[in-house]
Amino acid sequence: MIKTLTILTALLLAPLATLHAADAPTPPAKPNILWIIMDDVGAELPCYGEKKIETPNMDRLVREGTRFDRAFLTASVCSPSRSALITGMYQTTIGAHHHRSGRGTEKIHLPAGVEPVPALFQRAGYYTCNGGYPAKGRGLGKTDYNFEWDAKIYDGNDWAGRKPGQPFFAQIQLWGGKNRNDDGRWYRDEAPKALGTLTQPEDVTLPPYYPRDPVLLADWAQYLDCIRLCDKQVGEILQRLETAGILDQTIIILMGDNGISHARGKQFLYDEGIRTPFIVRGPGVARGTVRNDLIEHIDMAATSLAWAGLPVPSRMQGRDVFAKDYQRRDAVFAARDRCDVTVDRIRCVRTERFKYIRNFHHLRPLLQPSGYKDAKPTVIRLRELHAQGKLSPLQEELLFSPTRPAEELYDVQADPFEIRNLAGDPQFRSTLETLRTRLDRWMAETRDPGPESEKAYDASYAYELKTAKSPERRNPMMKNYELMKQWAKEGK
């Protein structure tokens, strides 16, 4: 009887297995590969739980592909993140971890055996391109790599320039959250034309560490509308591929380069800064699937090479997340270092349940003076509310404490906003010690070089000062540079 039931069960399940296989057709030998990268966009998408907006085109990608729910960036600001992404390497391993480093007199060169991924595709016969949206003239889309590289790794800025039948490896850079610019011009003049109705600030839900203040509510509403614009652009890209008859020959990956630009988001290692959307659609990709395994954005490099049938360099730290022998990660790692002239060093390790953060400059406040962040309307308003004593005790503690904990530990399942630091709780001492050791091991194994040399820092400062044309940018930068030097002397 048991044998009969087993056979019957197998017969009943066989059609389902066949259907699943049909939903994920074998990719062509050399599929087109398209990375769509949204600037300053985190995981605040409807398919990840956001309730206030609709994104039908991104939802289509999810229905027709695979959504990764635990995808994380190894860096929380654009240039280290993009340097890591394009090489499949931790930015710390390749020395590209300081924001906009290598631009001055102190150049950064990739280690032996490490190349930008487009060069590997190009040698394999792919047409490589990187464009903004829409691509304009001959200019490339955003690169922002912190190392020396040859622009010839890109054949152009749009796959329209390829030979007939030539496969392409393309990147499309969406302006994303940067459309929420400081003077509000885009939102005032262009957003209504592009989107029609706009998200109402009073409808927005903020994380508990931000006050429900009109400035912050309006800013978050604009951010959600930036995501809606990205969705519209994704729809236009899909339509273009469909019209050309190549949608089903193209593997698409949608992700962000860092989280929302906000006080506790971009530049920091809380999930608001490093959790990224990661959606994949195309031949060989299971449809309507959700994966909960931990992945890092550097995995996109190895995975893309494998799709094209190209060997993954032995030194590459990213993994092919669709490989039959794929070893799931039990933890992911991230690093934050100098941003503009503001010196910092933070490292973290995150498992499915816990996140451990180490603040090397814990004697400094979270919101150090920063020319970039201090110009944001949200941070300006937060500083005003802090000065007026109008923030809650929680908001004061998390945003404006004069120092930071040397170590932070969060149960991200029970505390997704990372509010309750468990590092001093005896109940979690074993977890703290385990993750502390795990982070130490990762830093050693990946050869984390740590702080920037004073010579390199000064060279980066000189470059930043030269490119800052207005007194509004130069004066705070010079003031912050002197403060960083003073704090360094004081051992902060």
Residue ranges of predicted features:
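Beta-rich accessory regions
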Residues: 436, 441-444
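Short, charged, surface-exposed hinge/linker loops at domain edges
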Residues: 451-465
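Formylglycine-dependent sulfatase
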Residues: 2-13, 19-408, 416-437, 451, ...
